[in-house]
Amino acid sequence: MSTAPLSGFFLTSLSPSQSSLQKLSLRTSSTVACLPPASSSSSSSSSSSSRSVPTLIRNEPVFAAPAPIIAPYWSEEMGTEAYDEAIEALKKLLIEKEELKTVAAAKVEQITAALQTGTSSDKKAFDPVETIKQGFIKFKKEKYETNPALYGELAKGQSPKYMVFACSDSRVCPSHVLDFQPGDAFVVRNIANMVPPFDKVKYGGVGAAIEYAVLHLKVENIVVIGHSACGGIKGLMSFPLDGNNSTDFIEDWVKICLPAKSKVISELGDSAFEDQCGRCEREAVNVSLANLLTYPFVREGLVKGTLALKGGYYDFVKGAFELWGLEFGLSETSSVKDVATILHWKL
């Protein structure tokens, strides 16, 4: 068995016949919960002694294209006016001018009737600004102002117990699905909830998030959640991935979980495309869990017992949620390929 060291220690699989406590066991223990211009001047650095020392034309960066000037053409502060303030203003007016009570009562009746009937002719076109405004007003009134203790603590800092990788799909917000409260989870959302392997250059954004969550926030759990009818996984299963990309970013991104596609094709090659996608949605989660092991600080947390990895799957069609975990241990010999074998996908 070929082995490859991973930052001073190794990973290996545990065969059925082996029971040594020194061996690593990394397996999915199914626990199901059902809920219905760089410059090239260096190459020509030799200069004549008669030349004058070059100077900058201006002491600021020069770009190939001017930076865009971005200025908001409107701005509105939200949450400063609310229903209660309007009611108080009306009460004050009626106290000062009692003769308006009859007129006010009639107006209130008209407003009430209009709100109750709500005919289709009264419906307005979708207003994105008003939707955001009303959404914040509702949040502030029903949640922020009713829980000052929670938001008071959050003003001091955050200490989430979870780091969650979830899909950007608008139907699967993890805070709604799992009823997370503000401060509970440090969330990263992207296409198909994928975690790329450790790479300081190519995937720095994801790496920075994992590093911050593990080393600074001290999260205790990293959860990767897949979901039903995932467009990213459908793309992974559909794209030829032969180097002739038809997209600027998507195909290169979903290649992260190409091992999951390979496994599904080898095992379900004759099955319907929808069934293949459903299987790949779960297998891609396992690929991401394995990729998390390539981050040194994640492995360190697993060894110390301060961090746990979990996989999840949300079926919003059936209203069900699956959760599984990974067990981790130390071994004297291991290889990256062994990790792949344990998770049942091919490198």
Curated annotation (Swiss-Prot):
Induction pattern: Expression reduced by 70% under dark conditions.
Protein EC: 4.2.1.1
Transit peptide: 1-113
Keywords annotated in UniProt: Acetylation, Cell membrane, Chloroplast, Lyase, Membrane, Phosphoprotein, Plastid, S-nitrosylation, Transit peptide, Zinc
Superkingdom of this protein's organism: Eukaryota
Modifications after synthesis and translation: S-nitrosylation at Cys-280 is up-regulated during nitrosative burst and suppresses both binding of salicylic acid and carbonic anhydrase activity. S-nitrosylated in response to an avirulent but not to a virulent bacterial strain.
Modified residues (Phosphoserine): 175, 266
Residues bearing the modification N-acetylalanine: 114
Catalytic activity: hydrogencarbonate + H(+) = CO2 + H2O
One term under GO cellular component: plasma membrane
Listed InterPro entries: Beta_CA_cladeB, Carbonic_anhydrase, Carbonic_anhydrase_CS, Carbonic_anhydrase_sf
Tissue specificity: Strongly expressed in aerial tissues including leaves, stems, flowers and siliques. Accumulates in both guard cells and mesophyll cells.
Modification sites for Phosphotyrosine: 203
Mode of membrane association: Peripheral membrane protein
One Gene Ontology term of the molecular function aspect: zinc ion binding
Purpose: Reversible hydration of carbon dioxide. Required for photosynthesis in cotyledons. Binds salicylic acid. Together with BCA4, involved in the CO(2) signaling pathway which controls gas-exchange between plants and the atmosphere by modulating stomatal development and movements. Promotes water use efficiency.
Subunit and partners: Homohexamer.
Family listed: Belongs to the beta-class carbonic anhydrase family.
UniProt cross-references to PANTHER family, sorted A to Z: BETA CARBONIC ANHYDRASE 1, CHLOROPLASTIC (PTHR11002:SF46), CARBONIC ANHYDRASE (PTHR11002)
Protein's name according to its UniProt entry: Beta carbonic anhydrase 1, chloroplastic
Native source organism of the sequence: Arabidopsis thaliana (Mouse-ear cress)
The organism's taxonomic lineage, starting at the top: Eukaryota, Viridiplantae, Streptophyta, Embryophyta, Tracheophyta
